[in-house]
């Protein structure tokens, strides 16, 4: 049997996790000479590369001096908490990557806590030590304190530390003596991380993720917990609800480099993919045909936020997307449920074209919307709503831990902003000329906070947050004060009319764009909504020469990303998402009907 090490790599967003995996693959000779290894091999999905975040976990294996190292890349964001937990179940140890300047961040804490609970032993890698002003030794102390506060065992606290720079491709015992390769880290992995325990007995495998191939259908991925599985073997699938189902394994694959390799049998400790099973979900156990003994299923974080999804019914529907009917959208949401553990979908009040979709946060849901948009779907999404719970007869809401790191001169602004949104400051630390402020804040208060924080700190703030717990309802929060500017009728927007209306507020459209009546085209300076006509062109007669009049000077439009739109809209507005554009609109397009319903 080959010597195996299963290792998960955990880190905060953008501390260089995916870069490190690239370098490990390079060291394991996964690329032939001259093969394109432009980096970020694992973040293969376009969205992941653009945002620089890992959303789905991946598996890769490398060979190092005769030992097979299975590397599992985990998402760092707590919005993808469902992913993190099940991935750590496959590992025997973890690498905790920390930025030598920023130190441990809320998300690091989130992933580390899960890893320590399962009992994994960490190797701490202090990365980016080539950055100016970094403080590797302090960061090491901070990590130790963090683990101590998370109730780590003595064995876990006796962790090895590796210093280095993944980007420049070196790792060493001491940051003052750089080497020119990352061998030190790989040797440490083989030395420190335990080999998987070999458990004899009837086979058990917990399904922790899914793969899909159009050729063989759904594929179950997991780690063999005990015993041996072989091709053509009869097995029982034990479902989460306790139902048992007899079936047969067609093929078994193990991860080899970037791809997969077909094998006859796998032993305990192997991570493998199993082809040919029909009905299974994540969290089911594949066990012995005669005496099934299921493993305990994975606990998954409950969703904390929900949104209303509806089909696109605006005047421009079907012009830009391929999939626009309710059947298309419904099938796509059902397909997403198979892979996306923390997601919930239910029809809205018996309607066939409206769904309530719940997830872990705005980021989690907006990644789903953005993915659908790129696949050619058109849909509309309502304002994100927090999921309340009734605990001991009291209305409770989700509270998050929020960390803001800003230059000192902006700290009072930040505290003011967060406390207005019912946040409570829990700690404040000064590090050099920057301040680290921690708050407990309702999830409702975080919606739309990021844009304001960045504006107020001139783009200098680093903001991170993660779900903490449910607490009693904190009271009303004042959201955006300004009203919307609404297009009066459908047509093309003209520079002439936009120019005349500039003093009324900021515009979200450029001259020449098509608009429809009821579309939100700008933000009004006052708190009431204003219906404006942007489709009016300049009347030219033979009295007026076209040249002598003054030119229209139009300020460029405010460009908003999908998340910003979702956080910006009010309760009576929707975001319309199509492959080519993101528009905001009123739910009731007709102005008179809208006035009437406001009176009621």
Regions found by a protein language model. Give the residues of each.
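P-loop NTPase switch module centered on the Walker A-proximal segment
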Residues: 1-98, 102-104, 142, 210-213
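Conserved structured catalytic cores and adjacent interaction surfaces
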Residues: 2-19, 91, 101-113, 119-121, ...
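Residue-level signature of catalytic and energy-coupling elements of molecular machines
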Residues: 14, 20, 52, 73, ...
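Interdomain boundary/hinge elements
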Residues: 36-42, 150-162, 196-206, 242-255, ...
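Canonical P-loop GTPase G-domain recognition
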Residues: 121, 131-191
């Amino acid at each position: 049997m080959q010597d195996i090490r299963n290792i998960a790599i955990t880190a905060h967003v953008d501390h260089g996790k995916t870069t490190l995996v690239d370098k490990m693959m390079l060291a394991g000779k996964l690329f032939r000479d001259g093969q394109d290894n432009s980096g970020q091999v694992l973040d293969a999905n376009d969205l992941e590369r653009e945002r620089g975040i890992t959303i789905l976990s991946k598996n890769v294996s490398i060979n190092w001096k005769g030992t097979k190292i299975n590397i599992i890349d985990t998402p760092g964001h707590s919005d993808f908490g469902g992913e993190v937990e099940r991935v750590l179940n496959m590992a025997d140890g973890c690498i905790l990557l920390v930025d030598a300047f920023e130190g441990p961040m809320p998300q690091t804490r989130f992933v580390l806590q899960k890893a320590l609970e399962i009992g994994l032993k960490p190797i701490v890698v202090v990365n980016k030590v080539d950055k100016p002003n970094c403080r590797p030794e302090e960061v090491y102390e901070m990590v130790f304190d963090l683990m101590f506060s998370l109730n780590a065992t003595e064995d876990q606290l006796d962790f090895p530390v590796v210093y280095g720079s993944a980007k420049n491709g070196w790792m060493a015992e001491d940051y003052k003596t750089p080497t020119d390769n990352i061998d030190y880290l790989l040797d440490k992995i083989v030395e420190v991380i335990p080999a998987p325990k070999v458990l004899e007995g009837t086979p058990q495998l917990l399904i922790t993720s899914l793969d899909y191939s159009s050729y063989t259908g759904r594929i179950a991925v997991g780690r063999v917990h005990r015993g041996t599985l072989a091709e053509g073997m009869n097995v029982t699938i034990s479902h989460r609800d306790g139902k048992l189902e007899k079936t047969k394994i067609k093929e078994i694959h193990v991860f080899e480099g970037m791809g997969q390799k077909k094998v006859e049998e796998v032993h305990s400790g192997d991570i493998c993919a199993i082809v040919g099973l029909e009905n299974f979900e994540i969290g089911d156990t594949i066990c012995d045909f005669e005496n099934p003994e299921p493993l305990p299923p994975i606990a998954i974080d409950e969703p904390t936020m929900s949104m209303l999804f509806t089909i696109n019914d605006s005047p421009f529907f079907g012009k830009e997307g391929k999939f626009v009917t309710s059947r298309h959208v419904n099938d796509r949401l059902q397909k997403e449920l198979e892979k996306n553990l923390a997601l919930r979908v239910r029809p809205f009040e018996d309607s066939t074209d409206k769904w309530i979709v719940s997830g872990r946060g705005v980021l989690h849901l907006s990644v789903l919307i953005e993915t659908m948009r790129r696949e050619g779907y058109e849909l509309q999404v309502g304002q994100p709503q927090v999921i309340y719970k009734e605990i001991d007869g009291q209305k409770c809401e989700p509270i998050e831990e929020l960390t803001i790191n800003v230059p000192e001169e902006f700290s009072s602004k930040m505290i003011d902003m967060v406390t207005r949104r019912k946040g409570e400051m829990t700690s404040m630390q000064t590090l050099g000329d920057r301040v680290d402020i921690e708050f407990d804040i309702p999830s409702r208060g975080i919606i739309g906070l990021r844009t304001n924080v960045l504006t107020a700190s001139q783009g200098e703030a680093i903001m991170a947050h993660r779900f903490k717990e449910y607490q009693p309802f904190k009271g009303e929060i004042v959201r955006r004060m300004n009203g919307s500017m609404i297009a009066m009728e459908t047509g093309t927007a003209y520079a002439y009319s936009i120019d005349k209306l500039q003093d009324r507020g900021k515009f979200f459209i450029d001259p020449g764009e098509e608009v429809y009546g009821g579309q939100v085209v700008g933000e009004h300076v006052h708190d009431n909504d204003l219906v404006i006509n942007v489709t009016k062109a300049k009347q030219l007669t033979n009295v007026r020469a076209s040249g002598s009049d003054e030119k229209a000077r139009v300020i460029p439009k405010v460009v908003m990303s999908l998340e910003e739109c979702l956080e910006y809209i009010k309760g009576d507005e929707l975001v319309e998402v199509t492959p080519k554009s993101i528009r905001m609109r009123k739910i009731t397009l007709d102005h008179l009907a809208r006035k009437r319903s406001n009176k009621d």
